[in-house]
Amino acid sequence: MHETLQEYLSRCLRISKSQADKNMDTKEFLKEKMREFFIKESNDGANPICSKEELVEFLEDGYLILDYFQKSKNFNNFFSLKDDELVAIEQPINTKILENVNFMGFIDFIVRSKKTGRYRITDFKTSTKGWSKYQKSDPIKNSQILLYKKFYAELIGISPDIIDVEFIILKRKVAEVEDFTIPRISKHVPASGKPSINKAWKGFSEFVESVFDSEGKYRTDVEYPKKPSKLCGWCEFFERGLCDGK
């Protein structure tokens, strides 16, 4: 889904939206990307990651997201054809934290305002029904994009004060409400001033120091008590049988 939006947006901002709509079959592009992903992750179909029915459902949900986004009135709520200048897609970040320990990631989308010169980092997030207020206030979710802001500013040598950040949340499922239309795509803009960045950096640094020593080796002098929760099913240690999740 993200690759499809990135390619479509690239064409919109580099050429024109009318040409992107005319020359790019976004649904066919999405279908092909999902097919490639399914084959790769399923070991050429030997170990399917989902059923055929589920794959079709995911694809149809993606079509609805694309239909919504490509309508000009919706598109204009997120991007400006006149003001947004495309800077980067999948911008790599590889910053040294400690010896043999680097922060690595890819920023989905970066634009710069032609009027003000401000940068905007966009992170696309696909969600079943959108983010709740608890998810929007989750420090771990927000810290990711705040660290992107810090490290990208350092990478290109600019002040983080001229970088804005946002999550664009793509909802696979939208409840039907008679009185009003619930948007299929929404935006979450977390606080990203200096105090927020410092707090995110402090939390991340403490995590790194609790896991690695000064040489970048895993610490063996620390015990990490398990914290059972409904998220245990997603944990690698649970899947590998290293933890019972209880």
What are the functions of these language-model segments?
Residues M1-K246:
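RecB-family 4Fe-4S metal-dependent nuclease core
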